[in-house]
Amino acid sequence: MCPEEGGAAGLGELRSWWEVPAIAHFCSLFRTAFRLPDFEIEELEAALHRDDVEFISDLIACLLQGCYQRRDITPQTFHSYLEDIINYRWELEEGKPNPLREASFQDLPLRTRVEILHRLCDYRLDADDVFDLLKGLDADSLRVEPLGEDNSGALYWYFYGTRMYKEDPVQGKSNGELSLSRESEGQKNVSSIPGKTGKRRGRPPKRKKLQEEILLSEKQEENSLASEPQTRHGSQGPGQGTWWLLCQTEEEWRQVTESFRERTSLRERQLYKLLSEDFLPEICNMIAQKGKRPQRTKAELHPRWMSDHLSIKPVKQEETPVLTRIEKQKRKEEEEERQILLAVQKKEQEQMLKEERKRELEEKVKAVEGMCSVRVVWRGACLSTSRPVDRAKRRKLREERAWLLAQGKELPPELSHLDPNSPMREEKKTKDLFELDDDFTAMYKVLDVVKAHKDSWPFLEPVDESYAPNYYQIIKAPMDISSMEKKLNGGLYCTKEEFVNDMKTMFRNCRKYNGESSEYTKMSDNLERCFHRAMMKHFPGEDGDTDEEFWIREDEKREKRRSRAGRSGGSHVWTRSRDPEGSSRKQQPMENGGKSLPPTRRAPSSGDDQSSSSTQPPREVGTSNGRGFSHPLHCGGTPSQAPFLNQMRPAVPGTFGPLRGSDPATLYGSSGVPEPHPGEPVQQRQPFTMQPPVGINSLRGPRLGTPEEKQMCGGLTHLSNMGPHPGSLQLGQISGPSQDGSMYAPAQFQPGFIPPRHGGAPARPPDFPESSEIPPSHMYRSYKYLNRVHSAVWNGNHGATNQGPLGPDEKPHLGPGPSHQPRTLGHVMDSRVMRPPVPPNQWTEQSGFLPHGVPSSGYMRPPCKSAGHRLQPPPVPAPSSLFGAPAQALRGVQGGDSMMDSPEMIAMQQLSSRVCPPGVPYHPHQPAHPRLPGPFPQVAHPMSVTVSAPKPALGNPGRAPENSEAQEPENDQAEPLPGLEEKPPGVGTSEGVYLTQLPHPTPPLQTDCTRQSSPQERETVGPELKSSSSESADNCKAMKGKNPWPSDSSYPGPAAQGCVRDLSTVADRGALSENGVIGEASPCGSEGKGLGSSGSEKLLCPRGRTLQETMPCTGQNAATPPSTDPGLTGGTVSQFPPLYMPGLEYPNSAAHYHISPGLQGVGPVMGGKSPASHPQHFPPRGFQSNHPHSGGFPRYRPPQGMRYSYHPPPQPSYHHYQRTPYYACPQSFSDWQRPLHPQGSPSGPPASQPPPPRSLFSDKNAMASLQGCETLNAALTSPTRMDAVAAKVPNDGQNPGPEEEKLDESMERPESPKEFLDLDNHNAATKRQSSLSASEYLYGTPPPLSSGMGFGSSAFPPHSVMLQTGPPYTPQRPASHFQPRAYSSPVAALPPHHPGATQPNGLSQEGPIYRCQEEGLGHFQAVMMEQIGTRSGIRGPFQEMYRPSGMQMHPVQSQASFPKTPTAATSQEEVPPHKPPTLPLDQS
């Protein structure tokens, strides 16, 4: 067919190749889409004939550009690409020899070149952009069909232009095959193809890719068979039918047409009709136009050509006038034609678009109106094939509309009426079919859940009047589940609201017909709760729930929680706390398990009046305590601390109540994770003095399995929410056998581990709501999921400030978050939990220790505080949530100031003494609230007193920052002090309060102290504080966000934040000053300060901060393992905190918990609880396990950048215990905390009660130590002092000189420790002395203090700091006590010299500083003992830590061990883990 020589083939031969018109047709069709050259068939034919390399090369380059989707292929560089594609497509895919292997394209035979060109057209249709470029084209319109055939079987082909080809079927298969293939390809009637549709190709048009390929494959097979042997001219190859050009001139067209005129066969008559009517007239016009075109073309090209060739200038000049005229005229005509064409095309396109949109709208209307039937079909996945396309189009239109709206542009009419005009309501119309389908699926799921409920049987079928007389007379709109299912099946529910309304109607009918007290009504209530749960589960992202529904659900949940709390003994408080006033009113009586405190809290939460709060809380605490003790029976007949916490919580509704009250599910229980119920471990441990004897062991033992305990666990969380007191309880509870025994394997973090809180996202703490600035999630995000109470604890602090709002927020706390957050703190703080390990006598002995359980010192004060600062007690717990006491201390001192420093706090401390009796367990503490028996009481009281003394300033606006902090809780309770209230939100009392509160909260330290604490922190915190508590909280959160544990950060309450931050800073400084962990530690105010700011930060929160520092050390392990210093045990701890963050409230708290292996008891609460989340280096309870140095806690980096990014680098496991600050209770809790610390912090002082004296930096040990000791005493005795000490310690770590002094001054200035002592009725000095002497400074010796503060070892210093920070929680001091007692070995070293630099965590033994031997011996002592039992190493103690009194977390730690606190203490001294034992509280 093609001459073998590369020369030009004869025209006749060329015209016999159908590929030539096919190529020309392809280029004509897709010229615009594929950017192909514009030419006619004749031009291509001429170029091939002349062997026009330029023309052919340009065409090939354009085709290859499309095939390879690149624009750098030119006529000069196309050869390599051509060879590549032919090699792949032609040779590999089709198996034909690659002709380009032996010769270049130009050297190939013409026939082969034509075939290659034709194949390139096919390949171009396989490119990636074809779909997009041709999506608007119809395949049928592109396909070339024969015009017809005659009797002989010859086919007549028209491609385009003015040519018609004839294919004779004569020779061969080629022809026959071709014709067959064409026909098979869809050869249609000649009439089916408009005259100009086709191109020149006669065969299978290139139009359709598949057809083309079929044709080509056939052709090429023929060619391969015939081309080699054949050297034919013409189209008469052996296997090729003859193709030849039938006609191209007007005359030829007429002749061919006439030749069919007389034909008789149907085919030929049809062909004639088509040619004569459709083609001939058009072809004649085209030919006429074509005749003019060449002249025009010449005219156009001539001038150009001439301009290119100057040699022709003369000719050009001659022709110029004529050519110019012709050219202008021609161009004008062409332009007019083009404009007309464009206008026509545009109109056509617009018309098509309109029709398409109209069609879509009609379909949409049909779809919506026919939804009933369609929905049923949807459920069977039997959608019509066109629906997905329609939906895709509708979605695209919606997106386009949304984009235009977002740009503020006007919507075209077609986009402004996307919704079908149907009689349906607008809401129905807005739903897309997709959404409706999803809603239907969800409705079916909800209905299935409801039907499967055990109480659904009365509602499954329509009511029969045979057993329900006159039913249909009373009920006008009957409804039942089967009827709803029928409606659903029938597609009658167009919106979720209709479905919900029917369900509500059913429940309403039941209530209306059966009455309120009917069994059926109760069943309907159960079913309704089930329904709401299912709705929330299956309609997750919906914000369609009305406020009414939300509150109904909240009420139901609260009711549920109440009943659960009743069972657990004190878990109801949280539920009650949910609403500021409602919580008290509902939960107050019975829910609390007979705690009047909830009411107190409610009163404060309602924000009725601070003063009332301050007075009320004490009273309530007393009552509540009494009741609480009753309630605590869970614990084995002793008042449950959880109840007490609850009581306290009422005082601080936002802090505790709301959290707890917010959502039964919110707490651990809510999350679905086994939650420690308030009645459980904590409650078991709750009884202060009583409990140690009765509850300690029994609690310990039963804790895991006791239902109460479980409730306690939940309650704990709630308790934590309750504030320092509950927090402590919680810690204890958690620390002991896990409240949900099964929930946390004893091996993990049973006792203090609060991980159970995992169950739910932390709802924003009740107290948080008030401080909207600090989203609950920020506060407790970190552990939020773990504890669900994280925020609550901090919120306790925060809540204190947000007491009123908290009430309602409690509901928001639906998630475990808010409610549980305090509880989490509680866990960590739960001195009781920690305390239980201490022998009953020890507990008594450590009034301060148990007292935290007894509201008198810590909790007491909180109640007092509650009275004065409704939230104060809880706030303190909140701040100390993280570390238990520290939180409270923080609150009292900084955030804690509001508690301790305010008159209310003082009153509370006094009340604490009184409350102690109500909280019988605390009676030792209670009488001498400030100076409970033993150092602990002293510490606790001094802390309390300190806070209280300054607290006297509670009403002390002058003390606005501190006071405000302190009052914050109060505000939450009753009135929002501007600063306070602000603080609650900003500081979030939970979070900001700590951070800010730390600086701000210590009334004694006052803002000055806070600010003095650390210029940096103050800079951040101060401003935040100043600007607004809410802001502060948020900032804290933000800062925290920087921390590895943002969530933790979120969780930690102000106290937690502050404490944590301090701790973190301490830990950072002490341990590694890890990458600004300290800075992080002070996310609140000095997040960016880095390590250096750690000291400042600490200063910032002398009390709270110090606490925080201590806690961070602890929390660090748990909370900041990953980001913070892995070397710090924190690695594990860190991991663990975010998840677990037992201190939920204070992720930092969790970090604190984790911070030190020792803190594991606490840490576990935080991290331990979420062992999974925070695998933590320390296995279950073994912070040590991760603790690179038992003494070093990984700094606690709140996942969310807690206010206090306290990332004590290597705080030993104690730091977890440092969480002891968790013990938010002023004295009792403080004492508890103290034990907690020894337990949790080998370093000595638990994070919960890191006394400011405890310098954050080791290097500061000497100075800070002495000073710290004093400060610690002061802090213990007075929150202000604590703050000062805390500040000092941090400063010591960084700038010991000025800042420390400043801090000290400011702390003392606002309210000197003496003041606190006096206020406490426990003479701060006496208490301090007792505390120091007994425990040789809670954290041991001044040196330890220094180390603690400086976090030299970063483990206990935070502890120490925490102790200081948590004066409200003397227990923090007990941390050191614990150390001494819990770890007799560490006690020796810790008590005397915090220098604990020897401690594993590198901190001076903080335990000693606070180690009121008596107090410390209590709770923490037990922990320490356990640790000693486990004393095989830090790990042992850590583990012990984790398994607080009753916890079996560490086999090593035996319950007996706790009683042997002294031994444990010793152990702790040698091993920082001794502090970790402090954590046991947390570890439930």
Swiss-Prot record:
Region (Disordered): 170-241, 556-704, 796-825, 919-1053, 1165-1259, 1287-1320, 1442-1484
Tissue expression summary: Highly expressed in skeletal muscle, thymus, placenta and lung. Expressed at lower level in brain, heart, colon, spleen, kidney.
GO cellular component labels: CERF complex; euchromatin; nucleus
Skewed-composition ranges (Basic and acidic residues): 210-222, 1304-1320
Domain of life of the source: Eukaryota
Record field: compositional bias (Basic residues): 197-209
Main location: nucleus
Compositional bias per record (Polar residues), positions renumbered to this chain: 223-234, 1451-1469
Subunit structure, interactors included: Component of the CERF-1 ISWI chromatin remodeling complex (also called the CECR2-containing remodeling factor (CERF) complex) at least composed of CECR2 and SMARCA1. Component of the CERF-5 ISWI chromatin remodeling complex at least composed of SMARCA5/SNF2H and CECR2. LUZP1 is detected as part of the CERF-1 and CERF-5 complexes in embryonic stem (ES) cells where it is involved in complex stabilization but is not detected in the complexes in the testis. Interacts with CCAR2; CCAR2 may form part of the CERF-1 and/or CEF-5 ISWI chromatin remodeling complexes in ES cells.
Domains as described in the record: The Bromo domain recognizes and binds acetylated histones. Also recognizes and binds histones that are butyrylated.
Role: Regulatory subunit of the ATP-dependent CERF-1 and CERF-5 ISWI chromatin remodeling complexes, which form ordered nucleosome arrays on chromatin and facilitate access to DNA during DNA-templated processes such as DNA replication, transcription, and repair. The complexes do not have the ability to slide mononucleosomes to the center of a DNA template. The CERF-1 ISWI chromatin remodeling complex has a lower ATP hydrolysis rate than the CERF-5 ISWI chromatin remodeling complex.
Full protein name: Chromatin remodeling regulator CECR2
Source organism: Homo sapiens (Human)
